[in-house]
Amino acid sequence: MTQAKTFKVTLTKSLIGRKENHIASARGLGLRKINHTVEVLDTPENRGMANKIYYMVKIEG
């Protein structure tokens, strides 16, 4: 069987004072606190959310 492709996203900056839709994107990816890392499926939806908040996350993979 093939493994589903994933990528890691780490929240590097605070969500305080950010736009509501950017906070929603971070929460949608499962990010909660600064330096919290999650591994999500590499889908267009997840890539779009990560790209929307590129300035406050680190993307690996």
From Swiss-Prot:
One of its GO terms (molecular function) is structural constituent of ribosome. SUPFAM superfamilies: Ribosomal protein L30p/L7e. GO terms for biological process: translation. GO terms for cellular component: cytosolic large ribosomal subunit. CDD domains: Ribosomal_L30 (cd01658). It comes from the Bacteria. It holds the Pfam family Ribosomal_L30. The keyword Ribosomal protein applies. Keywords: Ribonucleoprotein, Ribosomal protein. Part of the 50S ribosomal subunit. PANTHER family: LARGE RIBOSOMAL SUBUNIT PROTEIN UL30M, MITOCHONDRIAL RIBOSOMAL PROTEIN L30. Belongs to the universal ribosomal protein uL30 family. This is Large ribosomal subunit protein uL30. It comes from Francisella philomiragia subsp. philomiragia (strain ATCC 25017 / CCUG 19701 / FSC 153 / O#319-036).
